[in-house]
């Protein structure tokens, strides 16, 4: 029984209820019934009518009766309402309410169960099946709803609901192998007429699952001729915990660990899975508690564990919690988990985004004092993070601070900074940064000029692009293929085809190899302006690099298109 998967593991029992008793109708049906009765217009000339029961006695009010018209006038049309109409409309209304609550709380940290409880919708098997059908491509969300529905009063899953859930878990594009464990347990119960699965049987199922599907460990051990010290079932157990955590059922996953840890010894990966689960649902207190328990158990968290958690908290805006975890990492962490420049970069960006400039620069000094030397990736992460948060002034201060401490930025750092400014079309800031590069005697590279040229064309400023081209000649920076491509594309976009054809001819004369996609786009542009001579010349040039027959056929095709366009 899948709806009690978690409680089975927690209580070491697996109860299967296949009750076929129809659920009670909700008060919603009565409301819809009243609306239907009010909408029926009865002709005053009705001569006679007979009384019939509306439906079976399973309605809330079995004494309710409805008049059934025997005779009406010829010019009157009568609207009938029956039990199927009421059931369908009521079911659709309930499905709409539940689906809206689910869609509004899709994230793992959202309390979907609370939102569903507040919807106050009485569950029926058709309603549950319709919700599962709508969530057939979101197996994690579907399983989360299925688990919630199974714990509601006055409702129990019927076989059709189990079939829907099993089909979703086994037919999605992710092919989650974890749920094959559930299939094995259901098969065991069916074949042995059991309502309880023993712990020993569960361990045997996990062991067989590991041997059948997690074969990479055994293959590695056989190839290297080593003995695997870990229990084979712990790998399958960790995968099951991971599935629960990804579905937002972290509390149930931790309860499962508490019940099973005396039979299956947890490893570091077990704690990491639950730790990431608490971070995913944004519960730092329980995450820190589990981390302390992990250390007490003799497992040393790796640096990746801390970095992933800090990054998760920072993205969620929980900077104080991330700072507490960072301090815990320094004070109680081991040498293996000591903070690196990447960890400092995450915290620096988070503090800058939350307008904590003083703490940000204090952390920079702390990074230098601990011996974490900044590298290119550190500059890149910090500058990109600050610029994306529109903290350009703080990014400049960061460069000044690092320069004062003896770590001046290089051309790669400046280019990372410049790329963010150019992508956000901040022309003044980009030119200011370029002037700063020149003043600091950091020679701009060809990538620097390429970004400036692309930015000017995006800002519809071809003169600025030509000035950048001239600046390259003054500083003896040779243009590469990307420079020519940026200039030619920009000139075509600005409807300056003559200058674009001139540069394209220069590409041919220099013997530069154009990327085939760019070559294809240039031929299309030349075809639009009707320059057949340039088409043939570029095609002949590209024969040196690409398939001759393909280039010839493409050129002839473009020639015919150009001739046809000119004829119109």
Curated annotation (Swiss-Prot):
The keyword Ion transport does not apply. Gene3D superfamilies: Tetratricopeptide repeat domain. It is found in: Mitochondrion. Pfam families: PPR, PPR_1, PPR_2. Residues 1-55 form a transit peptide. Belongs to the PPR family. P subfamily. This is Pentatricopeptide repeat-containing protein At1g73400, mitochondrial. It comes from Arabidopsis thaliana.
